[in-house]
Regions:
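Active-site environment of divalent metal-dependent phosphoester hydrolases
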Residues: 55-56, 82-86, 106-109, 127-130, ...
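Active-site-proximal loop/helix segments of hydrolase catalytic cores
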Residues: 151-152, 156-225
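Active-site neighborhood of phospho(di)ester-bond hydrolases with catalytic His/Asp-centered motifs
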Residues: 48-50, 72-80, 100-103, 180-186, ...
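Flexible, acidic/histidine-containing loops and adjacent segments that form or flank the divalent-metal
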Residues: 131-159, 163, 259-274
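Binuclear metal-ion centers of metallo-dependent hydrolases, dominated by the metallo-beta-lactamase
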Residues: 98-99, 113-132, 220, 224-274
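Zn-dependent metallo-beta-lactamase
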Residues: 2-46, 53-55, 144, 255, ...
Length: 274
């Protein structure tokens, strides 16, 4: 089994990444804790996934200033829970960019007046879109979870539960063919055996914390089913319930061709096509 530790040495201000790569082939991921990733593509596009940032206890303080994220091209949200939709509506309005997520979530955001239809378009699992150019394909796939949207009504001050659509994962195929599978929140399910040969993900972003998502043992089994070149564990340690650890995931995974990169919040990792 291959493992590397990737992240940001906050005290020294040093970023640890893979060896230098030609800019046109480089893919850079910034992890902001939980399931939040900023993806810089080889063609210069910026994709933000599940931006739970300002209220995230694991996001470093310097990144809680949303302006530091820079210009974004699109936001992807895997489901309606607050630790995934997070700051997405704020960023969408601030930068005038679209949020793509479950169709039911888009409907709710529009119905409640949080976003306009232009900023919350609809799609569903199985669909593939090209919202930021023909060379980047984004496909929604199944996730085994729930997706309620919790809303505090500004008039009544009461907490309301609204439709959030079905939870999803995202297959993100970049300009150079490098493919990322962000699983969102999910349990283990049998159709993961189809995703590997169908989409051939190079990089798997996989939840391991347990309780609400896969625990390390199930996450290891999912990794064996998908067989990516690389895997980054996520969605752990943010709350006491998410007790699974990267060490447990690595132990459960055992000997494998998948290279596991354990990141720290605020850290970056750089990839090329394997």
């Amino acid at each position: 089994m291959r493992q590397r530790i990737w992240g940001l040495a906050l005290g020294l201000g040093l970023a640890f990444t893979a060896p230098a790569l030609a800019d046109q082939e480089k893919i850079e991921l910034l992890w902001l804790g939980q399931s939040a990733f900023r993806i810089n593509t080889p063609g210069g596009k910026v994709i933000l996934v599940d931006p739970f940032i300002t209220q995230n206890p694991k996001t470093p303080a310097e990144w809680k200033d949303l302006d530091k994220l820079g210009k974004l091209d699109v936001i992807l949200v895997t489901h309606a829970h607050g630790d995934h939709i997070g700051d997405a509506p704020t960023l969408a309005k601030k930068q005038n960019i679209q949020i793509w997520g479950p169709a039911g979530l888009a409907d709710t955001l529009v119905e409640l007046g949080i976003l306009t239809p232009e900023l919350a378009p609809r799609m569903a699992k199985g669909g593939t879109i090209h919202p930021i150019g023909p060379d980047i394909a984004i496909t929604q796939v199944h996730a085994e979870h729930s997706s309620e949207f919790i809303y505090v009504n500004p008039e009544t001050k009461k907490r309301e539960v609204h439709v959030g659509g079905e939870p999803v994962g995202f297959i993100i195929k970049l300009e150079n063919g490098f493919t990322i599978y962000h699983m969102g929140d999910t349990g283990l399910f049998g159709d993961l055996t189809l995703i590997g040969p169908r989409y051939r993900p190079d990089l798997l972003l996989i939840p391991i914390g347990g309780h609400f998502v896969m625990d390390p043992s199930d996450a290891a089994e999912a990794t064996r089913m998908i067989r990516p070149h690389f895997a980054i564990p996520m969605h752990y340690g943010t709350t006491p319930q998410l007790a699974g650890t990267p060490e447990q995931y690595l132990a459960a995974l055992g000997k494998t061709a998948t290279e596991v990169k354990v990141m720290q919040p605020g850290g970056t990792a750089v990839f090329d096509r394997p």
